[in-house]
A protein has these predicted regions:
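Short beta-strand-to-loop acidic/aromatic patch adjacent to the donor-nucleotide binding site
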Residues: 91-102
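Glycine-rich, basic loop-to-helix element that forms the pyrophosphate-binding segment
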Residues: 69-86
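Acidic donor-binding loop at a coil-to-helix junction in glycosyltransferase catalytic cores
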Residues: 200-207
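A recurrent flexible, glycine/aromatic-enriched loop bordering the glycosyltransferase active site
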Residues: 157-185
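Short beta-strand-to-loop element that shapes/binds the nucleotide-sugar donor at the catalytic cleft/hinge
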Residues: 124-141
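Short, well-formed alpha-helical segments that are part of the catalytic scaffolds
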Residues: 16-30
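Acidic donor-binding/catalytic loop of UDP-sugar-dependent glycosyltransferases
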Residues: 101-114
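Active-site donor/metal-binding and catalytic loop motifs
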Residues: 221-255
């Protein structure tokens, strides 16, 4: 085991039992690493039947879990994971993954590599992130079950569009949103940073700015990683933000841009740190090796989906 590191891999679940179980299984399928880790399920839901079935599955599988109080917002669920991690002092780092997403088997291999090379890291965001979709777009790969995968390799040319210096894209007509998935937190983060439950759409985006500004003040160290063979985002699920958006395009629910939440976040940025230096181009980027190429990714996705 990697000396001095102990990882709490927390799966946050609120609905959709089959996706939640899929996520848990991918946490347990990690390969080629030497990290001491525990998979831990946080059940944060208002659906009592789902709560019962999820607890039943965890008991049957021998997986530790905790039921936390839910108000129906994604922020409250994610903050409850922070609270669990804060209580579990034996763990050095937290991985917080939404139960409708899932991991490649090389995820922990990347975490180990990064923390070995950059041990003072407090936050890692993965960008770009592989995703699965209901509808086809140019460049997507069709999977056996009829859905499509948008997969990244080692082409970094698009980073110039996604990682703006100076001013974030939220202040332009072509807001790209926060495309990064926050995949690792050190013990420095919980109890100091929180997801805002008033930011019903874009809570990840808002905490990104809090972390970015803290990085600029030299209070924490926030990295972006190019390791696309880590996390898979499932855009076919029907989560809280899609329910709030209630927007269907080509038969698929999407998270619609919400002007109220967008303007609230812009105002927050202006008051907190100012428009300038709001771009994430100041964050260091770890151009990580790719352990899983496209063909291996497709094979894994066809087996897990």
């Amino acid at each position: 085991m990697k000396e001095g590191l102990k990882i709490l891999m927390s799966v946050l679940v609120s609905s959709d039992l089959s996706r939640a179980i899929r996520c848990i299984k991918t946490c347990l399928l990690q390969t080629e690493h030497n990290l001491d880790f525990q998979t831990y399920v946080v059940i944060n839901t208002q659906d009592k039947e789902f709560e019962r079935k999820m607890a039943e599955y965890c008991n049957w599988s021998g997986i530790d879990y905790e039921i936390t109080e839910s108000d129906g917002t994604a922020s409250t669920g994610k903050n409850s994971v922070f609270e669990v991690f804060h209580k579990k002092k034996e763990f050095t780092h937290l991985i917080q993954i939404d139960g409708d997403d899932f991991l490649y088997p090389t995820f922990l291999r990347h975490i180990e590599r990064h923390l070995t090379k950059y041990p003072n890291t407090d936050v890692i965001g993965i960008l770009p992130c592989d995703s699965i979709y209901m509808n086809y777009e140019e460049g997507f790969h069709k999977l056996n079950n009829g859905i499509y995968a948008g997969l990244w390799g080692t082409n970094y040319s698009s980073w110039y569009d996604w990682i703006p210096f100076e001013v974030d894209s939220i202040f332009s007509d072509k807001c790209t949103g926060n495309l990064a998935r926050l995949m690792l937190f050190s013990r420095s983060i919980p109890n100091k940073f929180f997801y805002d439950k008033e930011q019903v759409i874009g809570e990840d985006y808002k905490i990104h700015f809090d972390l970015l500004f803290a990085h600029q003040r030299d209070e924490i160290t926030y990295w972006l990683s190019s390791a696309s063979d880590t996390w898979v985002r499932d855009t076919t699920s029907f989560g809280v933000q899609k329910q709030e958006s209630n927007c269907v395009v080509d038969g698929e629910y999407i998270i619609r841009r919400n002007d109220e939440f967008q303007e609230r976040l812009k105002s927050y940025i202006e008051k907190t740190n100012g428009v300038y230096r709001s771009g994430s181009g100041e964050l260091p980027i770890d151009f990580a090796p790719l352990y899983m190429g496209v063909e291996r990714k497709i094979s894994f996705l066809n087996n897990i989906l």
